[in-house]
């Protein structure tokens, strides 16, 4: 028998639930098409399902007809994007995760205090672009670092006037190392009162650390562009456990299961539970084909998540203040 352990918690977080519900509610109330800037969450299954219902995903606002309804993704947007939306007279539902908005508020406060700000995050990630875009380049100074090596190379104007924030979906351990490097190099740097890495990211990484003590293979259900899903793979590999990420059950390779006795399954914060169930079905098929083995599925205990975020008002808003 092959033992399969399900990480707990796994899958959707409160911010993802909220973002998807905002799109579905807008479609129900106003009908298709509803435009969404960027994938509302980084999961192909979710995006394709919403497209079938009438959502249209765009990267550039030029693709959105003037006066149309637009939803900002859970990753947040820069002030420049908000200005462009206002100029095009777009009606906005903002699906930015409240925990990302918290970081935006921190950046605005630090900038108002005249701080130079260091952001710890991944170059090119939409959350990073949105957060970096909370201050005007002509007025404030913001730097991006990803590793301790980046910190060693960082050149700032005033070492005594620094603050830092982080992307919400980083590896907790990696972020801690970068923060320590910042504090070692810039002893007067200050950080947020509460960690920026979100509760769901922390909980899912902790659950994988529990899995790797019991399993010889970890499968992460998530899309390649999902930061938090990639970090779950990294957590397992950092513990010298074989780990793979799959966007759909068909990507699960038979060779991965060879000589494996215990397999751990988890899912990124943007991956729905239906994909986990499909992966389990695929595992059972492979196990039966390889050696007529059965599969014993167990759910591990874990942190109970009760966080919920309220939806925005049912009416879209205009960001005229950004014009």
UniProtKB/Swiss-Prot annotation:
The EC number of this protein is 1.17.7.4
Keyword set, alphabetical order: 4Fe-4S, Iron, Iron-sulfur, Isoprene biosynthesis, Metal-binding, Oxidoreductase
Any GO BP annotation? dimethylallyl diphosphate biosynthetic process
Reaction(s) catalysed by this chain's protein? isopentenyl diphosphate + 2 oxidized [2Fe-2S]-[ferredoxin] + H2O = (2E)-4-hydroxy-3-methylbut-2-enyl diphosphate + 2 reduced [2Fe-2S]-[ferredoxin] + 2 H(+); dimethylallyl diphosphate + 2 oxidized [2Fe-2S]-[ferredoxin] + H2O = (2E)-4-hydroxy-3-methylbut-2-enyl diphosphate + 2 reduced [2Fe-2S]-[ferredoxin] + 2 H(+)
Cofactor(s) the protein needs: [4Fe-4S] cluster
**Active site, per annotation:** 127
UniProt cofactor note: Binds 1 [4Fe-4S] cluster per subunit.
Q: Which GO terms describe its molecular function?
A: 4 iron, 4 sulfur cluster binding; 4-hydroxy-3-methylbut-2-enyl diphosphate reductase activity; metal ion binding
Note the superkingdom of the native organism: Bacteria
| Gene3D superfamilies per record | 3.40.50.11270, 4-hydroxy-3-methylbut-2-enyl diphosphate reductase, catalytic domain
Name the positions where isopentenyl diphosphate binds.
42, 75, 125, 226-228, 270
Which residues are listed for dimethylallyl diphosphate binding in this entry? 42, 75, 125, 226-228, 270
* Record: residues binding [4Fe-4S] cluster: 13, 97, 198
In terms of CDD domains, this protein maps to: lytB_ispH
Associated pathway: Isoprenoid biosynthesis; dimethylallyl diphosphate biosynthesis; dimethylallyl diphosphate from (2E)-4-hydroxy-3-methylbutenyl diphosphate: step 1/1; Isoprenoid biosynthesis; isopentenyl diphosphate biosynthesis via DXP pathway; isopentenyl diphosphate from 1-deoxy-D-xylulose 5-phosphate: step 6/6
Give the binding site residues for (2E)-4-hydroxy-3-methylbut-2-enyl diphosphate: 42, 75, 125, 168, 226-228, 270
Q: Which family does it belong to?
A: Belongs to the IspH family.
Q: What role is this protein assigned?
A: Catalyzes the conversion of 1-hydroxy-2-methyl-2-(E)-butenyl 4-diphosphate (HMBPP) into a mixture of isopentenyl diphosphate (IPP) and dimethylallyl diphosphate (DMAPP). Acts in the terminal step of the DOXP/MEP pathway for isoprenoid precursor biosynthesis.
Name-wise, this protein is 4-hydroxy-3-methylbut-2-enyl diphosphate reductase
Name of the gene encoding the protein in the UniProt record = ispH
């Amino acid at each position: 028998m092959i033992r399969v352990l399900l990480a707990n918690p796994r899958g959707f977080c409160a911010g993802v639930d909220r973002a998807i519900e905002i799109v579905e509610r807008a479609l129900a109330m106003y009908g298709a098409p509803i435009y969404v800037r960027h994938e509302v969450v980084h999961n192909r299954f979710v995006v394709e399902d919403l497209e079938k219902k009438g959502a249209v995903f765009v990267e550039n606002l030029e693709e959105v007809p003037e006066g149309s309804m637009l939803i900002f993704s859970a990753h947040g947007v820069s002030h420049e994007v908000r200005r462009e939306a206002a100029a095009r007279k777009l009606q906005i539902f903002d699906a930015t995760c409240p925990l990302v908005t918290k970081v935006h508020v921190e950046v605005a406060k630090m900038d108002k205090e005249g701080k130079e700000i260091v952001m710890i995050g991944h170059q090119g990630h939409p959350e990073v672009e949105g957060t970096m875009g909370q201050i005007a380049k002509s007025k404030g100074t913001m730097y991006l670092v990803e590793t301790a090596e980046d910190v060693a190379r960082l050149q700032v104007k005033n070492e005594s006037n620094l603050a830092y924030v982080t992307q919400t979906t980083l590896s907790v351990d990696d972020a801690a190392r970068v923060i320590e490097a910042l504090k070692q190099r810039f002893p007067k740097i200050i950080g947020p009162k509460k960690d920026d890495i979100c509760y769901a990211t922390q909980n899912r990484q902790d659950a994988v650390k529990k899995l790797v003590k019991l399993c010889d293979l970890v499968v992460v259900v998530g899309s390649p562009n999902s930061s938090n899903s990639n970090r779950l793979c990294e957590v397992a590999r950092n513990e010298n456990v074989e780990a793979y990420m799959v966007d759909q059950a068909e990507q699960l390779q038979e060779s991965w299961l060879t000589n494996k006795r215990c397999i751990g399954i988890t899912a990124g914060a943007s991956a729905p539970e239906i994909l986990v169930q499909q992966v389990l079905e695929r595992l059972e098929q492979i196990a039966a084909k390889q050696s007529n083995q059965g599969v014993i599925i167990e759910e591990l205990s874990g942190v109970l998540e009760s966080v919920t975020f309220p939806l925005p008002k049912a009416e879209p808003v205009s960001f005229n203040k950004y014009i």
